C-alpha cells in the first residue's frame, strides 16, 4: 500500500513556495503519493482570525521584524529567493480555482512547472 501525504497549498503563500520543491525532492527518494489540497489561506485567516488583515494596517514592529527574519532564515535554508510582489498578499482565488479544475481533470499541473 502506497503511503500518502496531503499537501495543502495556496499559490500566494510564501510557505507553499518554500516547501514545494522540498516535497517534490522528497518524492524522488521516498515512495508515497502526493494528494494535492488547494486551499485559500486568506479565507482561513478571515474565518479563524479576521484581525490578521487588520494587523497589517498597523503592524507591531517587533512581530513584523521577527516574521521577516523567520522568512529570511527559511529562504536561506532552502536556497530559494523570494521576489515579493508589490502588492502582498495577493488575491489568489482565481488561480486556486484553476488548481481545483486541474485536480478534477486529474492533471498534475504542479509538476509541469518544475525544472528538475
Residue ranges and their predicted role:
Residues 18-27:
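Typically the conserved alpha-helix immediately C-terminal to a functionally engaged Cys/Sec
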Residues 33-43:
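A short beta-strand-loop structural module common to alpha/beta enzyme folds
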Residues 94-98:
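Conserved N-terminal beta-strand and adjoining loop/helix that marks the start
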Residues 3-19:
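Local sequence-structure signature of Cys/Sec-based thiol-disulfide redox active-site neighborhoods
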Residues 46-53:
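Short, glycine-/aromatic-enriched active-site segment of Class I SAM-dependent methyltransferases
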Residues 113-116:
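Conserved small/polar residues in nucleotide/adenosyl-binding loops
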Residues 53-75:
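Short, structured active-site "lid" loops
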Amino acid at each position: 500500500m502506497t503511503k500518502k501525504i496531503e499537501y495543502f497549498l495556496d499559490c500566494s503563500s510564501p510557505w507553499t513556495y518554500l516547501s514545494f520543491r522540498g516535497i517534490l525532492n522528497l518524492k524522488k527518494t521516498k515512495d508515497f503519493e502526493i494528494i494535492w489540497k488547494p486551499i485559500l489561506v486568506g479565507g482561513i485567516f478571515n474565518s479563524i482570525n479576521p484581525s490578521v488583515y487588520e494587523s497589517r494596517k498597523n503592524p507591531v514592529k517587533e512581530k513584523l521584524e521577527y516574521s521577516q527574519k523567520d522568512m529570511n532564515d527559511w529562504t536561506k535554508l532552502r536556497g530559494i529567493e523570494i521576489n515579493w510582489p508589490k502588492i502582498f498578499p495577493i488575491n489568489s482565488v482565481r488561480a486556486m480555482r484553476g488548481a481545483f479544475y486541474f485536480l478534477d481533470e486529474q492533471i498534475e499541473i504542479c509538476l509541469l512547472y518544475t525544472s528538475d
